[in-house]
From Swiss-Prot:
The name this protein goes by in its record: Acyl carrier protein
Domain Carrier, first and last residues per copy: 2-82
Post-translational modification: 4'-phosphopantetheine is transferred from CoA to a specific serine of apo-ACP by AcpS. This modification is essential for activity because fatty acids are bound in thioester linkage to the sulfhydryl of the prosthetic group.
InterPro entries: ACP, ACP-like_sf, PP-bd_ACP, Ppantetheine_attach_site
Pathway connected to this protein: Lipid metabolism; fatty acid biosynthesis
Entry keyword annotation includes ATP-binding: no
Biological source species: Dehalococcoides mccartyi (strain ATCC BAA-2100 / JCM 16839 / KCTC 5957 / BAV1)
Gene name per UniProt: acpP
Amino acid sequence: MATVFERVKKVSVEQLGAEEKDVVLTASFADDLGADSLDQVELIMALETEFGTPETKFEIPDTDAEKLKTVQAVVDYLKSKGIKDS
């Protein structure tokens, strides 16, 4: 059973090349994990893929994506959109 955090962590490690130990709830994608603006766009796209299904596309609007600066912000956002631990 994977939590929302564990899934976000997995995507962050894969997309950003971050060390697993560095992907903590308080981590900033830019400051702590070294993501530039392109990395952050690619991360959002990967999160949309991770949390969507073939039947239900999951989309994070640009206006929301701009606010997702930390791992905690992403986890909270996903949970607010009905994503649950699996």
